[in-house]
Amino acid sequence: MEAPYSMTAHYDEFQEVKYESRCGTGGARGTSLPPGFPRSSGRSASGARSGLPRWNRREVCLLSGLVFAAGLCAILAAMLALKYLGPGAAGTGGACPEGCPERKAFARAARFLSANLDASIDPCQDFYSFACGGWLRRHAIPDDKLTYGTIAAIGEQNEERLRRLLARPTGGPGGAAQRKVRAFFRSCLDMREIERLGPRPMLEVIEDCGGWDLGGAADRPGAARWDLNRLLYKAQGVYSAAALFSLTVSLDDRNSSRYVIRIDQDGLTLPERTLYLAQDEGSEKVLAAYKVFMERLLRLLGADAVEQKAQEILQLEQRLANISVSEYDDLRRDVSSVYNKVTLGQLQKITPHLQWKWLLDQIFQEDFSEEEEVVLLATDYMQQVSQLIRSTPRRILHNYLVWRVVVVLSEHLSPPFREALHELAKEMEGNDKPQELARVCLGQANRHFGMALGALFVHEHFSAASKAKVQQLVEDIKYILGQRLEELDWMDAQTKAAARAKLQYMMVMVGYPDFLLKPEAVDKEYEFEVHEKTYLKNILNSIRFSIQLSVKKIRQEVDKSTWLLPPQALNAYYLPNKNQMVFPAGILQPTLYDPDFPQSLNYGGIGTIIGHELTHGYDDWGGQYDRSGNLLHWWTEASYSRFLHKAECIVRLYDNFTVYNQRVNGKHTLGENIADMGGLKLAYYAYQKWVREHGPEHPLHRLKYTHNQLFFIAFAQNWCIKRRSQSIYLQVLTDKHAPEHYRVLGSVSQFEEFGRAFHCPKDSPMNPVHKCSVW
């Protein structure tokens, strides 16, 4: 799944653009008098008089009036032709509809594109700076954000729409889920009540977990009854806090028609294991800030021996980091190499210090047999976790597990807790100002009531007509991939047949799931209590209900049409174990997509993102799954070897890019780079197909660029973005995407059609002689 490409971008007030007639004639030219009226013979004025018939005065006046009326009609006809014919109606086959919205959209598009450009930069030298230079000059990063870009601007508009929807009264028409999400939003905004409660709600949770230090001291009677498995049940099965490992219900990678319990490495608070190892100055700063954060939260919660507790918990997390494997390691990307299906009996032998049957029986409310199969994705890690449990004092294990619950819930507490979180985020990512409360609460509403909020969003901000148009655009791009597969000279016939089958079976979801149109169906997703005065309790109710829904899946039939994200999400994704692409309504907004924009911009905008997700089905990760979403090697050895050889060229290309003295990791970002490059090509060729079928588009007013050039400009302007320097460190370390500058340069420089469109000299930076290409 893609990380969020985190709703219309900051358009100015655009003036209307006046177009000439599509027919290329002036409004008065070719206008003839009505039948029966004689034409002028071209004689001089003096000679004309002698040729007039001798009409009486009344007839002369009548004729003059008719001539005046005819002239007025001609002028009106010219004005109407100027207004309703022209570039704005391109592709409509005639006059555009009343009001001509596409003409205004063309004007907006022209203003947006030209404002973002920096025409002083040679596009053949640095296309990103050419396409985004104007935008980068005009925009600063808001104080409460880590990054800001053209897609983030779309997010701002979507957020404003969602806030207005949530601000409406709780009563009135609509289902129970809609009333609950509004009540939840209000409970989050009620900072007076949250502040009045202070740490008390969290202290109740800690007490439920057994308190700190096994009830206060290691020699108390309660310590003798301490049970690691019971506390793991509380953490994982009640509060959804991953500790020591993660426990989820997922599709079985080798049999995607069934759900399976999946166990994997987890339990670290910081986002990447290398941050715990303090291998460079950046990670040392993060680790020091994390230690301060731990001590601050422990003091707020009234813990004793704060420094000692923090140090012991940190050391335990460092031990977990040392036995973990980075998510970007080759081992983790090869799913077949980590997939290990075992019975509960076998799992018990791998990790003898955990009581797996008891733990799973409690969480799932089942009576599992020893033969129940689970998927273990980190066998070596779990063996070492068992040894870590054996060698770690119970008090430290207990405090670590309680800490993991505290970390998960602390963002929902009173201002002192939120300030501590902000100070850590500031050191890690550089955001100077905490998010305003309304944005925080909107984020929580999205997280806990995503589909309920989505039902409100699509009802008012995404039409069925837009859904149909985007679906057609997706089909056009899929068609091009089918053609490209036939043309590949490095893939043999057997592998091509399997690749075509995968394309044919691929599911495409656009806009929103249909069940959102039925309030009673949405209500079933949120059958838990919500009260406006109990924010943290609302969170806990949501967590417990989500766990209930998840554990029920283990015996349910798989429905591959379900969505991972709600429709207002500013994201798009491909799921290999479903062979499913999803394009939510939240990302199908201007400037990425506008039904009235020139198609060059739609294909360069949302089209390249569609192509990106489509290509994920055939990259180094998605290519491990077959047409049904099963982990199955469908390549011949010869074709796969040639694929890896071509992929290595891309690895070397991105390894040569640096940002803030950090080298981009070409292997780490390989899948996304393949998808960027492939998506650009697929969308471009799909646009050429559209032009062949509908005819060329009229130029954008006052822009000297061809529509082929505008396609590439639109692609680049998807990724106009500014980042804080601290966040760049984490991006290069943890993000599977290359920095945006190089997402653009790496893609266009390897595509021969870009060099042709901009007439770039051979071996110029954007048109190297030797290019990397997979799809």
Curated annotation (Swiss-Prot):
MF annotations from Gene Ontology: metal ion binding; metalloendopeptidase activity
Bilayer topology term: Single-pass type II membrane protein
Positions in the Cytoplasmic compartment: 1-61
Biased composition range(s): Low complexity: 32-51
Entry EC no(s): 3.4.24.-
Highest taxon of source: Eukaryota
GO CC entries: plasma membrane
Residues of the Peptidase M13 domain: 99-775
Induction entry: By mechanical damage to nerve cells.
Cell compartments where the protein resides: Membrane
Biological process, per Gene Ontology: intracellular signal transduction; neuropeptide signaling pathway; protein processing; respiratory system process
Record-listed Zn(2+) binding positions: 612, 616, 672
Residues in compartment: Lumenal: 83-775
Keywords: Disulfide bond, Glycoprotein, Hydrolase, Membrane, Metal-binding, Metalloprotease, Protease, Signal-anchor, Transmembrane, Transmembrane helix, Zinc
TM spans (from-to): 62-82
SUPFAM superfamilies, sorted: Metalloproteases ('zincins'), catalytic domain
Cleavable signal peptide: none
Principal place of residence: membrane
Carbohydrate attachment residues: 255, 322, 656
Record's function text: May contribute to the degradation of peptide hormones and be involved in the inactivation of neuronal peptides. Cleaves the synthetic substrate Z-Gly-Gly-Leu-pNA and releases pNA. May protect against C2-ceramide-induced apoptosis.
Protein family according to the UniProt entry: Belongs to the peptidase M13 family.
Protein name in UniProt: Endothelin-converting enzyme-like 1
